[in-house]
Amino acid sequence: MLEFPLINDTSRKIIHIDMDAFFAQVEMRDDPSLKDKPVIIGNDPRKTGGRGVVSTCNYEAKKYGVHSAMSSKEAYERCPNAVFISGNYSHYREVGMQIREIFKCYTDLVEPMSIDEAYLDVTTNKLGIKSAVKVAKLIQYDIWQELHLTCSAGVSYNKFIAKLASDFQKPAGLTVVLPEEAQEFLKKLPIAKFHGVGKKSVERLHDMDIYTGADLLKISEITLIDRFGRFGFDLFRKARGISNSPVKPNRVRKSIGSERTYGKLLYNEDDIKAELTKNAKRVAESAQKAKKVGRIIVIKVRYSDFSTLTKRMTLDKSTQDFDTIDRISHSIFDQLEENSSGVRLLGVTLTGLEDQEGRQLDLDDLA
């Protein structure tokens, strides 16, 4: 029977920090009148003829079922008393850099996953603190004292479990999963909550009657590899709390894009959006093939006079999903000022990339 060794490094101390509803929280901090109000970062559909999409929202808005990538129109229907804010992304980036400076006070092993979340390896740290839990509490305290923002923290021996833990008690939560607790923690977790298991994989796992970590634990390694290829190899280990991916402080930020130049100018909106969809499909397929996900979607439009417009939207969660990339691309285009000039070039880019957690490994890599 095909079997690979199970090597589990439980000696590390990893923290995952995730800011709570970051964009909305910054707006609420800067404008105290927003306190206790549902806040949605996205264009107000009453001002755009129903066009637009939700970038993120605060917890008050989430109570109404509002979530990232939802159309602004639907968000308004669910929560008509919400305050819509178009968003100041350069300001959010500035605040994100301030948060990163706080991380650097504790360790240089910081792997930013996006503007508002990062992994930290504090196995050895600048303050010589042996307890990772104490470091996490100090970071939460520093962020609150210096920036008046809250974050949630997950502490464990690897990135996979630390990421899951940070999402366990939001907002302002701290969840610790020790090596001896990992198996029980994962058993109870719905498979859809496993970081890196996408929507299509969840559906396939459900078809196998796998709904929780406990269900996944019952499936043999060879069966998972047979059904999912390299991803199955990784799933088998994740179910057992095994993930030895290092914190990479120098990870390279890349983007995945698709753009086309048209010899015959595009004037009709339906034609333009059909081409946007083709670009979005190519981007999604490339991201899935590269095992990358991204949080920022950018579109580029060049007109017949060679004037060029680019506009971006940052999402709550990373994606490689075609439907999401396509919908957001169309929404961004709808926000551009009308231009009667023909379109010469269209592009869609996914950036703010990170590795898809649970990325698939070639069996040759294990030789």
From Swiss-Prot:
Keywords: Cytoplasm, DNA damage, DNA repair, DNA replication, DNA-binding, DNA-directed DNA polymerase, Magnesium, Metal-binding, Mutator protein, Nucleotidyltransferase, Transferase
Domain of life: Bacteria
Signal peptide stretch: none
Active site per the UniProt annotation: 117
Site annotation Substrate discrimination: residues: 23
Primary location: cytoplasm
Subcellular location: Cytoplasm
Residues involved in Mg(2+) binding: 18, 116
EC nos: 2.7.7.7
Positions of the UmuC domain: 14-198
CDD domains: PolY_Pol_IV_kappa (cd03586)
Cofactor note: Binds 2 magnesium ions per subunit.
Statement: the UniProt record of this protein carries the keyword Nucleotidyltransferase: yes
Family statement drawn from the similarity comment of this UniProt entry: Belongs to the DNA polymerase type-Y family.
Role description: Poorly processive, error-prone DNA polymerase involved in untargeted mutagenesis. Copies undamaged DNA at stalled replication forks, which arise in vivo from mismatched or misaligned primer ends. These misaligned primers can be extended by PolIV. Exhibits no 3'-5' exonuclease (proofreading) activity. May be involved in translesional synthesis, in conjunction with the beta clamp from PolIII.
Protein name: DNA polymerase IV
Protein source organism: Streptococcus thermophilus (strain ATCC BAA-491 / LMD-9)
